[in-house]
Every structure is written in C-alpha cells, then in structure tokens.
C-alpha cells in the first residue's frame, strides 16, 4: 500500500480548478496540476484493500463496478507514493493502452468503487493516473516500441476513434501490419472531433498518433471505406478488416429538421473543425439564444462550447425532476452560472 496511515493523515485534494470566469475566456485545460509533494500524498491515501474493488471491473445488478480495464490501481498508487514513476508507468501500461485519454475523460468508476470513499473521500485515482502518464511523456519515458518481429498478416482497422486506436495498438504489438482508415482529415474520431479542447487537447491526441506511427501503424486519412475504397478492394489488400466506426446516426426527433436545430455531436464537431481551421459547416452559438435539450455529458460539453463562443443566453431543458443527483453541478454549469448569474437548467420539461 501507499502510506499505512495515509487515508487518515491526508484528506482528498483534487487538482485546483481555474476560475469559471477565466475558463470561459479560452480553451485551455480546466484544472491546474498539484505539486509533486501533494500528488504523492494523494497516492499515499490508497489502502491496497484486500479486495480492491477499484480495479474489479465486474457487473453487479446491471451496473459496472470498478475499472473495466482492470488497471492495477493499488500497485501504481504505491509506486507513485514512493516516487517510482517509471515503475508506476510500467504497471499502468500493463493494462491501459492510452492512459492520457482515460485520465482526462474517463468517468472514474474506480473512484466510485473505492473503499476509502465509504467512510471518507475516495482516492484521486484518475488524477494520479494522469500524473504518471504526463510525467512519462515529459521525461521521455514514452518511447516507440515497434514489435521485434512482423507476421505476414495485413489488417485493416476502419475508424480511428478509441476502439480503432486500441485495436491498432494491440494488433501492431502482436507484430501484424496494421493500417487504420479514417474518413476525416485527422485521426482520433470523437477524441479529436467530439470531446472539447479544454477537456482533451488536440495536441494530446496528436502526440499518441505520432507514437503509434513510429511504432509502425499506418494511417490513411480522408479515406471513407465504401466511398473512396470499395469493400472488394479492402478485402483484396488485407487479410482481415475490423470495423470500429461508432454510432453515427442519432435518434430521430420530430423537430430535428427545423431550422437552427443541431444534434450535439454535429455541433461539437463543427466547433472542433473551427479550432482546427478545417472546412466544415459554420455552426456557432455566437450572439444566439441557445436551448439545449438533454442532461448527459454531451449536453454539458455543448454548454461549455456555447459559452466559449459567446452565446447571448443559454437554457437547458431536462425531463427528470430536480434531485440531489440531477442538481449536482459540473464544470459547465459552474461556468454558465458565472456568466449568466443563475442556474440555466429547467427540470421536468418535456
């Protein structure tokens, strides 16, 4: 374990958030890092439980409990507490191909399962993970690791979102020749075009793509399989094709065809294209009265983006009743309240 009495000696300390007023003025990350001393103290709170539910990744009564990747959380928390970043990195990479992504946008199911959270506050697992992987990149510990030998198998991966990149990562490590097809100008899928810049900077995705390329993965961008490349041509060139295209079609809504109505991912994509200076539909909330329908993570992302585009007003319609759970504010609602002086959410609205 970390420090035997760490969970008693240290209280949970999250990364300090920048002020809401400062955040809405730019696209920079939401939080500031802790000092190394405080980060190691946070890892020292891990108790190395006899049954580490944080890494269980099991389904119980229809709900997922713990990390679905089975990350060796107590092990790398202990190594981080002792200042052994390289050892912590090795244990982290044992189960997680892209910690720099999950440490930024994962819902942290590990923390919800943390035993320490039953009597106090859970360990800052997600932020500890981010500290390990960013230390590794900053100190040149993340070096290309191409396979020592290659097979004669050629594999096509269609789609370069999280699933496609994961498939490419593991298949390449096994020595196969992997080519990833992506219809957009840049790889990454929703990592690049769906998650807003302040939550997952584009440079973080590009850094990983560069590492994969150095390890031998080939990316063919601006290539839509079925349009630019026929299935027959794909079958002729490759021994196997894995389709990781994601869910592209939203649920139909009766008012979706009305003017000025956009699905969340279309809006977020347009914002990403604008930041990347890529051609695309000119969709912006600048100077507009904006209404958001829905209450999920995508809705919160749309709130944050609309604020940064200087919308004139913002209202979020939520069909659920107001409860302690639904009323909990995230960073987006803190920002909205800072800008407009009131909660933008309207509950029990159909």
Residue ranges and their predicted role:
Residues 1-154, 202, 241-267, 282-284, ...:
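Ferredoxin-type iron-sulfur electron-transfer modules and their immediate structural context
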Residues 117-125, 195-207, 221, 225-231:
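Short beta-strand to alpha-helix junction loop
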Residues 236-237:
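Alpha-helix C-terminal capping/helix-to-coil transition sites in glycosyltransferase folds
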Residues 144-158, 169-196:
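Long, low-complexity, intrinsically disordered polar/charged segments
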Residues 156-181, 220-232, 249-250, 267-328:
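Rossmann-like dinucleotide/flavin-binding elements
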Residues 177-215, 219, 303-350:
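Rossmann-like dinucleotide-binding cores of NAD(P)H-dependent redox enzymes
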């Amino acid at each position: 374990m970390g420090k035997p009495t760490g969970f008693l000696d240290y209280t949970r300390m999250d990364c300090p958030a920048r002020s809401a007023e400062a955040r809405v003025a730019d696209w920079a990350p939401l939080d500031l890092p802790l000092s190394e001393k405080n980060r190691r103290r946070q890892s020292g709170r891990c108790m190395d439980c006899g049954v580490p539910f944080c890494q269980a990744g099991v389904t119980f009564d229809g709900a997922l409990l713990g990390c679905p990747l089975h990350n060796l959380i107590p092990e790398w928390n202990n190594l981080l507490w002792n200042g052994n970043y390289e050892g912590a990195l090795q244990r982290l990479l044992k189960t997680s191909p892209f910690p720099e992504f999950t440490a930024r946008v994962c819902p942290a199911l590990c923390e919800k399962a943390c035993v320490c959270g039953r009597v106090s506050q859970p360990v800052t697992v997600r932020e500890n993970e981010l500290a390990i992987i960013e230390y590794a990149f900053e100190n040149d510990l993340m070096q290309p690791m191409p396979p020592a030998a290659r097979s004669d198998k050629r594999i096509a991966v269609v789609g370069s979102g999280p699933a496609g990149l994961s498939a490419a990562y593991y298949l390449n490590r096994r020595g196969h020749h992997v080519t990833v097809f992506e219809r957009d100008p840049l790889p990454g899928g929703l990592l690049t075009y769906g998650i807003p810049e302040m939550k997952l900077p584009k440079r973080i995705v590009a850094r990983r793509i560069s590492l994969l390329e150095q390890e031998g993965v080939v990316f063919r961008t601006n290539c839509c399989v079925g349009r630019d490349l026929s299935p027959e041509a794909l079958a002729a060139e490759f021994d196997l094709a894995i389709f990781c295209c994601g869910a592209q079609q939203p649920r139909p809504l009766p008012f979706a065809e009305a003017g000025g109505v956009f699905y969340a991912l279309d809006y977020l994509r347009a914002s990403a294209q604008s930041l990347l200076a890529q051609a695309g539909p000119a969709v912006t909330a600048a100077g507009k009265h904006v209404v958001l329908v829905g209450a999920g993570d995508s809705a919160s992302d749309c709130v944050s983006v609309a604020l940064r585009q200087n919308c004139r007003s913002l209202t979020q319609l939520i069909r659920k009743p107001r409860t302690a759970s639904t009323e909990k504010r995230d960073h987006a609602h803190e920002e909205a309240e800072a800008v407009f002086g009131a909660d933008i959410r309207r509950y029990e609205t159909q």
